[in-house]
C-alpha cells in the first residue's frame, strides 16, 4: 500500500518496526548512561569476557539487540527496493548496490566479531565513541594505512569522486553554454574527453563505471577490516616484508 507518494509494502512495515524499536533502545541506552550530550552518548558492545554469549541489557545487551534491529531495518529496506524495482519493471541495481553497504556493516558488527570470538570486537554506537574505536583499531595494527585493502578502498573512494565529478562538471558545462551559444549534447561531451584523454566512456558508461568504483570501494573497505584481526594480527607495516625480499633487489650491487 501507499502513504502519500511513498510505497510502503510489507517490508516497509518491517523496516519501520525495526527502525522505531532500534531508536527507542538507543534512547533507553542513553538514559542509562552518564550524559545526554549528543556527541558523548554511546551504546557499547559487551565486554570481551562475554565472548559470543548474550550480555545483560545494561552491559552490552542493548547493543546486541540494536544490532539485530539495524540489520533488520537495512535488510527490509533493501527488500522494499526489490519490490519497487519489480513493480517498475527495472533491474535490481539499486538494492544490489545497497546490499554492498549492508555487507560492510554486517562485516564490522557480526562477521568480524564472530571470527574473533567476541561481540566486544564490534564498534560502539555513538559519534565520538565510534571515532575513538576507529582510531584505536588503527593503532592496534600500528599503521592501518599500510593495510593493502585499505589502500585499495581509499583509492576507489577517491577515484569514484573524481570520475563522477568529471562527469557532473562536463554535463553542467554542456547544458550551461555562454550567452549566445546553443546547448551542447552527448556528442560534444564525448568529443571533449576524446580530445582531453583520448577516450570517452560514454553517457551510460560513466554511470556504470561510477557504480563499479563505488561498490568496489565498499567491498574493499569491508575486506580491509575483515583481514585485520581474524587473518592478520601483527602491525600492517610488517606485512610488507615480502617486498624487501624480492629477487630484483639482489641486482645493482647493493
Curated annotation (Swiss-Prot):
Coiled coil regions in record: none
Transmembrane regions listed in the UniProt entry: 10-32, 60-88, 93-115, 148-175, 202-227
GO BP terms, alphabetized: photosynthetic electron transport in photosystem II
Pfam name, any one: Photo_RC
InterPro entries: Photo_II_D1/D2_sf (IPR036854), Photo_RC_L (IPR005871), Photo_RC_L/M (IPR000484), Photo_RC_L/M_CS (IPR055265)
Compartments (UniProt record): Cell inner membrane
Residues noted as binding a ubiquinone in the record, renumbered to the chain: 193
Keyword match Hydrolase: no
Binding site for (7R,8Z)-bacteriochlorophyll b: 130, 150
Binding site for Fe cation: 167, 207
GO molecular function, one term: metal ion binding
Membrane-topology annotation of the record: Multi-pass membrane protein
Stored PROSITE patterns: REACTION_CENTER
A GO term from the CC aspect: plasma membrane
Keywords: Bacteriochlorophyll, Cell inner membrane, Cell membrane, Chlorophyll, Chromophore, Electron transport, Iron, Magnesium, Membrane, Metal-binding, Photosynthesis, Reaction center, Transmembrane, Transmembrane helix, Transport
Main location: membrane
SUBUNIT field: Reaction center is composed of four bacteriochlorophylls, two bacteriopheophytins, two ubiquinones, one iron, and two highly hydrophobic polypeptide chains (designated L and M).
Family: Belongs to the reaction center PufL/M/PsbA/D family.
Function field: The reaction center is a membrane-bound complex that mediates the initial photochemical event in the electron transfer process of photosynthesis.
The protein, known as: Reaction center protein L chain
Amino acid at each position: 500500500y501507499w502513504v502519500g507518494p511513498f510505497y510502503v509494502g510489507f517490508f516497509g512495515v518491517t523496516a519501520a518496526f525495526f527502525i522505531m524499536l532500534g531508536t527507542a533502545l538507543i534512547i533507553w541506552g542513553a538514559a542509562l548512561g552518564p550524559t545526554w550530550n549528543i556527541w558523548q552518548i554511546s551504546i557499547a558492545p559487551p565486554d570481551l569476557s562475554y565472548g559470543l554469549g548474550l550480555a545483560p541489557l545494561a552491559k552490552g545487551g542493548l547493543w546486541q539487540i540494536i544490532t539485530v534491529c539495524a540489520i533488520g531495518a537495512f535488510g527490509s529496506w533493501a527488500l522494499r527496493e526489490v519490490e519497487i524495482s519489480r513493480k517498475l519493471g527495472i533491474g535490481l541495481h539499486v538494492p544490489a548496490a545497497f546490499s554492498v553497504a549492508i555487507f560492510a556493516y554486517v562485516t564490522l558488527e557480526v562477521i568480524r566479531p564472530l571470527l574473533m570470538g567476541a561481540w566486544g570486537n564490534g564498534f560502539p554506537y555513538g559519534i565520538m565513541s565510534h571515532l575513538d574505536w576507529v582510531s584505536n583499531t588503527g593503532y592496534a595494527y600500528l599503521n592501518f594505512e599500510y593495510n593493502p585493502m585499505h589502500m585499495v578502498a581509499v583509492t576507489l573512494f577517491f577515484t569514484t569522486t573524481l570520475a563522477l565529478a568529471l562527469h557532473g562538471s562536463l554535463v553542467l558545462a554542456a547544458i550551461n553554454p555562454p550567452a549566445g551559444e546553443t546547448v551542447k549534447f552527448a556528442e560534444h561531451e564525448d568529443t571533449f574527453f576524446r580530445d582531453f584523454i583520448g577516450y570517452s566512456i560514454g553517457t551510460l558508461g560513466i554511470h556504470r563505471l561510477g557504480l563499479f568504483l563505488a561498490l568496489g570501494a565498499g567491498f574493499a573497505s569491508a575486506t580491509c577490516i575483515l583481514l585485520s584481526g581474524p587473518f592478520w594480527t601483527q602491525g600492517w607495516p610488517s606485512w610488507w616484508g615480502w617486498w624487501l625480499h624480492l629477487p630484483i633487489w639482489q641486482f645493482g650491487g647493493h
